[in-house]
């Protein structure tokens, strides 16, 4: 019974016994030989061979002798190879490509079946198309064909406003498409090249990460949903701002395009060609560079100074292609230049002089009291011209006129007070200064002090509508313009040239009736003399000029054709006075936001067709108003302290702006006592205060019409009564029907009159006389009493007549009768 149950479960009812407990089985007898003789012979042969093999395997065998070790063949000695000359360049090691990070792996995995390449006619990938939410989307500026047999034949709908085109995705591909989301809080997101930062409403990536050919790639969150589609990018120094297409919570498409955006379609670029003499070469691959041949490199730049690809040529000249990785911190465009001496109008605030820190120009275009100064010294470079953050170099005033260096702590800037230095590069300084009438740049060291002062009025500046001396810590941010402190940005160009030689008498020495040429240490000078015959020469050591006896017979000058200097009017320029070269002007003026104070909000009191502003501020604050009708009548006033200002408000409205607060608009909503939906006297009272003339005319017209109607009705009633009573008046002792008597107010039968009746009662029964006389008085008293009870009800909603019109706050008087706006 149990066996059948457990067999259903596929196992035995009890575990099988181990081998030691199994019963011994009888050895089966050998099978009887088959009758077939051939099969018997084969079986015997197999048994014999098996016994032979097993016997040899179990038989002990003597050990085999160990083979002798092999002798190593000695390779013939080769003659030593000659050493390669040091001039031969070593092969560069190809840097290993870094493995993709987690974000890149996730993006690559999701893009595998949902992102398609867009290729041009040559088969090059110039962008991408995206399958998302039942549509295939492609940037409009990517001109090419989708690399897919089905998607390439779809008909696309173009939208130039969003720089996108889309088509319906085939049904069999919709299940694998991306999904999008309108939620993108600030943080980091994923795309093909790693992480994308979203902050301040913008997507940014590190500089150099993305580029041409990435147009159409998606930006995804950690769930794989598409947050944005990349269209291009704008270089902003250390980071690149992306131009993207996103969606809001209502599903509406939003395109964000930073200033200076370039489309990232990998269109074929036309190589710009530059010239050197009659030879043309690609501007990005010049035949030499500045570190190899300084003079020739400057010749190339000067010949192509007006070329469209001048910046490309300048970067290539500075960074030699075979010199390995160039370091931006060591080599930049100001490496081509040199400091110089210039004429300063005020040295130590006294007399003009030659100064190593001559101020060429001062710009104060920023809104945050920051100024940009150009001098003849160079900041951020050491004596050799290499970039050094804590050094500056200047032209010495001594006889050798060599370039010397110092630390940036020696540089002082001041106006009416000390300035705070913000940044520096080349000839330029960026500083925040207090207001003043002049700008002074000084070199203050332990040995000497040199300064230069330029008369330039620096006015106090503030942003917004409230004056302040220092920016507040808390307040409101409003748009303003500031100088970009990044040294890589450019605000244009400054013109450069290679100066003509300068002759210095310090290069000549007269001793014992002889004239010697004395060059500075390590420099070459050229002398020209007229001592009978014309003599000239270039020397690097102290050399006697034969035949000359006085210094006035010679001139000696030093010529350096490997450096540019600023095209200053103090220097001897070349003959045509045109710019030979140009360099970038740093510290670009860019739009930004500045923190400004916000004054206390005014206390507003509303009245009939006017408002009162109770203002209180401890600094100058601007109050402006204007009417919103056809005649604005604007007003402006700077206010400080406590004050009250009253303004009239008409139906068109009034707008006022107090300090840096948002504009406020008020309108006159006229009202009056009474109720337009109440009792007749309330209606008349309401419209009488709103439109008195029209109300009087309407009431008068209604009264006249009513009086005419009542008069006509009375006359008609009298005529009808007379016509009804005439037949009965002509018949003696006629009895008038009761209904007609009631209708016409006549007695149905002859009776005594009221006078006769009262006379009779006075003569015969005076108590009844007084009772009869009190009946009308009692009726009059009852009527007056009823009127006194109904009067409070009829006048419950009536306002006092002297209140006048006010700005309404509610529709009915029983709700709130005293509160006004």
UniProtKB/Swiss-Prot annotation:
Native source organism of the sequence: Sindbis virus
Biased composition annotated in UniProt, kind: Basic residues: 67-106
Compositionally biased spans, kind Polar residues: 38-49
Disulphide-bonded residues: 283-289
Lipidation, S-palmitoyl cysteine type: 724, 744-745
Domain topic, free-text comment: Structural polyprotein: As soon as the capsid protein has been autocleaved, an internal uncleaved signal peptide directs the remaining polyprotein to the endoplasmic reticulum.
Enzyme class of the recorded protein, top EC level: hydrolase
Annotated glycan sites: 278, 524, 646
EC identifiers of the protein: 3.4.21.90
Effect of residue 215 to T: 90% reduction in autocatalytic cleavage by capsid protein. No infectious virus is produced
Segments of this protein annotated with the region Functions as an uncleaved signal peptide for the precursor of protein E3/E2: 265-279
Lineage, top ranks: Viruses, Riboviria, Orthornavirae, Kitrinoviricota, Alsuviricetes
Name under which the protein is recorded: Frameshifted structural polyprotein
